[in-house]
Amino acid sequence: MPTSLPSSLIATALLACVHGAVAAPMSLDDYLALNGPAPTAQIAYGPAPSQYAQLFRPEGSGPFPVVVLVHGGCWTVAFGGIKQMRNVAGALVAQGIAVWNVEYRRVDEPGGGYPGTYEDMHAALDSLQQHAPQYQLDVKRIVAMGHSAGGQLVQWIAGRDKLPKTSPLYRDKLLPVKNIVSLGGLADLLHEKDLIKTSCERDIAQLAGQPSATRPDIYSDTNAADLIPNGSRTVLATGELDTISPPRVAHDYAAKAKLAGDHAEVLILPGASHYDEIAATSNAWGMILVVVRGMLGMENEKNQ
């Protein structure tokens, strides 16, 4: 697996931007109306109603590269979620890429928040690894892509092998996931806590828990920016017109990651809102697809 982003990857993605007539930026209502094909299978990874993943598998024989999708919605049930991600899942399957579309317990569900939401990320990836042979999934070729709150979670996934051993979230055996696409993500819980409060009306304690004698630093096992360097390759793709997670957020995180020694690049999506970032029908999608295919080593394969 390459250890750095190809220098041409972002440039190629920018060239994929559709020129000519530009559609109006998508609204929240446009986003909530998104849908896509039915999954190949729905697989529970825990007993709670929200502890499951949807598998979308291309036709034919594998092994297939995998994209793990983690939806956003401000960590709450109020703003859609896994259903909207089906539109992207369908577009990826058409490229010969399998998709593991993750649902998880959110802060306003029993067991959600800290530590439950993060435990669900562990369990969902364990389930992917367990089911990979049955469905011919190549978990050595894997990208985790998350939108908004899901961006925070996939960036956390990249660093979970650096969790303190004293953390309730620590695990000693993990599926490595080091190729990350964060779409309008809000990953730096400490430095973006005011923005998270403004954009999502989330108190940081819901996402990071309360300090205690055994865990005085609530960010040590929740904040992606505290878990670098971790050997990840991250593209932070943000709509030019994103007001939920403005481009500054991506630039600030990329600067920290690169200073720490990780590979991180910013991709600004021209004319795109926060919701265009996760719509396969948007002008932005072609740029994002170039990044995903490049991370999976498919850049020289015919684009379908």
Which role fits each region the language model picked out?
Residues 113-132:
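Alpha/beta-hydrolase active-site loop
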Residues 27-32, 38, 48, 159, ...:
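Mobile cap/lid helix-loop segments that gate and shape the active-site cleft of serine hydrolases
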Residues 236-238, 242:
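Short beta-strand/loop motif that positions the catalytic acidic residue
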Residues 243-249:
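Conserved alpha/beta-hydrolase "acid-adjacent" motif
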Residues 126-194:
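Primarily recognizes the serine-hydrolase "nucleophile elbow" in alpha/beta-hydrolase
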Residues 81-100:
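Short amphipathic alpha-helix adjacent to the substrate-entry channel of hydrolases
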